[in-house]
């Protein structure tokens, strides 16, 4: 896994892994490369990441992921 240089916070492999899984699962759902790159844009702080969470039924864990995005 390559470190995203758009992320300016703390490098935490576990948090990156959690965020990356959302984007990977979303890509697997849609099989669209735009979804994969847009999900990761701006260090996961974007509307596509949130839409992916909704589509993957992860909104009950939104606060956990929002904190992770703020940290990384």
UniProtKB/Swiss-Prot annotation:
Its main location: secreted. It comes from the Eukaryota. Disulfide bonds join 7-43, 23-39, 26-52. The N-terminus forms pyrrolidone carboxylic acid in isoform CHH-II and is free in isoform CHH-I. It holds the Pfam family Crust_neurohorm. The modification Valine amide is found at residue 72. Produced by the medulla terminalis X-organ in the eyestalks and transported to the sinus gland where they are stored and released. InterPro entries: Crust_neurhormone_CS, Crust_neurohorm, Crust_neurohorm_sf, Hyperglycemic, Hyperglycemic1. GO terms for cellular component: extracellular region. Keywords: Amidation, Carbohydrate metabolism, Disulfide bond, Glucose metabolism, Hormone, Neuropeptide, Pyrrolidone carboxylic acid, Secreted. GO terms for biological process: circadian rhythm; glucose metabolic process; neuropeptide signaling pathway. It is found in: Secreted. One of its GO terms (molecular function) is neuropeptide hormone activity. The modification Pyrrolidone carboxylic acid is found at residue 1. Hormone found in the sinus gland of isopods and decapods which controls the blood sugar level. Has a secretagogue action over the amylase released from the midgut gland. May act as a stress hormone and may be involved in the control of molting and reproduction. Belongs to the arthropod CHH/MIH/GIH/VIH hormone family. This is Crustacean hyperglycemic hormone.
């Amino acid at each position: 896994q390559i470190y995203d240089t758009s992320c300016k916070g703390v490098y935490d492999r576990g948090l990156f892994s959690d965020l990356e899984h959302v984007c990977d699962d979303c890509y697997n759902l849609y099989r669209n490369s735009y979804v994969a790159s847009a999900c990761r844009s701006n260090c996961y702080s974007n509307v596509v990441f949130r839409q992916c969470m909704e589509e993957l039924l992860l909104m009950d864990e939104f606060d956990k992921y929002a904190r992770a995005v703020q940290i990384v």
